[in-house]
Amino acid sequence: MAREFSLPNTRNIGIMAHIDAGKTTTTERILFYTGRVHKIGEVHEGAATMDWMEQEQERGITITSAATTAQWNGHRINIIDTPGHVDFTVEVERSLRVLDGAVTVFDAKGGVEPQTETVWRQADRYGVPRMCYINKMDIMGANFDMCLGQIKSRLGANPVAIQYPIGAEDQFKGMVDLIEMKAIVYTDDLGKTSDSAEIPADLLARCEELRMAMVEAAAEQDEELMMKYLEGEELTNDEIRAALRKGTIDCKLTPVMCGSSYKNKGVQPMLDNVVAYLPSPVDIPAIKGTLPDTEDEVDRPADDNGPFSALAFKIMTDPYVGRLTFFRVYSGVLNSGSYVLNSTKGKRERVGRILQMHANHREEITTVYSGDIAAAVGLKDTTTGDTLCDEKAPVILESMDFPEPVISVAIEPKSKADQDKMGIGLSKLAEEDPTFRTRTDEETGQTIISGMGELHLEIIVDRLKREFKVESNVGAPQVAYRETFRNAAKVEGKFVRQSGGRGQYGHVWVEFAPLEAGQGFQFENKIVGGVVPREYIPAVQAGIEESMKNGVIAGFPLVDIKATIVDGSYHDVDSNEMAFKVAGSLALKEAAKKCGAVLLEPIMKVEVTMPEEYMGDVMGDLNSRRGRIEGMEARANAQVIRAMVPLSEMFGYSTILRSRTQGRGVYSMVIDHYEEVPKFIAEEIIKKSKGE
């Protein structure tokens, strides 16, 4: 089967935003206008096609990023709808990794919200070209100019308005196309028909000002255009579009559009702009990978004739076909029924069937081409972040980094008979979600599950019940504390067992030092003259790393330290790897006494929005939770407080906030950094961990 859409006519885009900015509704409208859905599904009716898990339909939020394909003006647009809730950042992270461009949706009243910032930073990290769509222009308090200002000041972006709204709130009628300088006014409820009209006189001056700024931004992308602009010549509309496209793809600027997806206004112009400004797979740099044997770096450009390479970015268990592996093809072609190599794990896999997904119904296809996103059935060993490639041309593509969980709870089945079923269910859910971990506590024998927040774990427990029919009891949430060293010290680790016969002998001197936050663990070997033979060095490192997992003061992982092995000794007969491994772990225990080990706790960036009359109450409450107020601002008939608060103080906060604000306050939080726990609290935690 030949390609239906050429590579330059393919777009892989994500739709991302803060929770409730209207992402899923926007995607629903795209599917409606591109002819993929005959009836529009509403999120608040629980009928949106992109939200296909039962929990999503009940809660009206998107949890898994459903991938779907749509067609518009001779282009194929593959869309990934990502969740906006902070607990599901993993979904956003993995979507961004396989996208070529994104549309960030803003709430015209809320502007830039905390999760928008988080998602924006994630997209910065992956260098994803973006456009902004200011949605909900029809609601009370909608303010396009405020949003434009915040995108610049809070996100540090270079926003360029290419549209301007006509009216706002219940007077919102359409928008001005600033390139053509024409008004687009909607005449029917479904937004399928629009008229082009003259720009209303009261908006003309502002539109001309924004058009000037747009032309200047376009001219900056190209030297020839800049000369033309400086010499006072008019740039043609095609020149402006081409320059804006270049600036968008180079991440130098971000086109800004507006509309109201719910009221069906602005979605078709947005689709035109996605095609006009966001990159196709051939417009962006080729993906880099390494050769498994030599570790040399190679490029895999988007080309059907190249060797097959793809990245698996999501695993899902489907009630009808079993395990689905979503993957993005970077180069080459794949036919169903063929074998591929999972180069990350070194295993051969057979691709049984290939499905093109449309939210939750699927179409079977026989071939996928470079630049496509599809789902495979039949892969047994492949997990998120693995590379799939041609067996004859192995390559390992850059994978993705996932954040460590910040919260844990103990879980047990309500009936002992379900113990095994629960274990199977949890391990399947952990396969799907790299930020969800499950382990058994060695001391208590309890099953501990960890994730990104209370909602994340709630959904996991809910899925256990629905998908695996296991009812469970859940303990109180526990914070994922960390430990680190404050000071540097040189310590000795010596393990000697010599009582006749073959003994054990391992002896090292190690310098431990604290590192900057987030640097993890570093190990350096400074042994000279072979006082410790080279083959024992990895054993010392392994001994230190294994002991770090269980910490030195309260059983929490030790992070951000450097260990340098500087001296030691060995015995010709009695030394072995095991002895040096033990010596490494003894050195760490010794360091705990001299390096001033301390506890660290996750600090959350919290934003609370409420009517002004509750300000005092809410601030007092945040202060009592060891919160630091960072700032306050008025936002569309409400007050917003920004604060840094330890996660341990935020459990159950939603209930308390509801009662303090009579249900009118909302909050969101994302992890910001780790900080040392105050001494009196640390003492309590250490006592508890020792069972005192």
From Swiss-Prot:
Gene Ontology MF, one: GTPase activity
Coiled coil: none
GO cellular component entries: cytoplasm
Binding residue positions for GTP: 17-24, 81-85, 135-138
Cellular localization per UniProt: Cytoplasm
Short name of one Pfam family: EF-G_D2
tr-type G domain boundaries: 8-282
CDD domains: EF-G (cd01886), EFG_III (cd16262), EFG_mtEFG1_IV (cd01434), EFG_mtEFG_C (cd03713), EFG_mtEFG_II (cd04088)
SMART domains given in the database record: EFG_C, EFG_IV
GO BP annotations listed: ribosome disassembly
Keyword Protein biosynthesis listed: yes
Annotated keywords: Cytoplasm, Elongation factor, GTP-binding, Nucleotide-binding, Protein biosynthesis
The protein's role, per its UniProt record: Catalyzes the GTP-dependent ribosomal translocation step during translation elongation. During this step, the ribosome changes from the pre-translocational (PRE) to the post-translocational (POST) state as the newly formed A-site-bound peptidyl-tRNA and P-site-bound deacylated tRNA move to the P and E sites, respectively. Catalyzes the coordinated movement of the two tRNA molecules, the mRNA and conformational changes in the ribosome.
Family membership noted in the UniProt record: Belongs to the TRAFAC class translation factor GTPase superfamily. Classic translation factor GTPase family. EF-G/EF-2 subfamily.
Protein's recorded name: Elongation factor G
Originating species: Brevibacillus brevis (strain 47 / JCM 6285 / NBRC 100599)
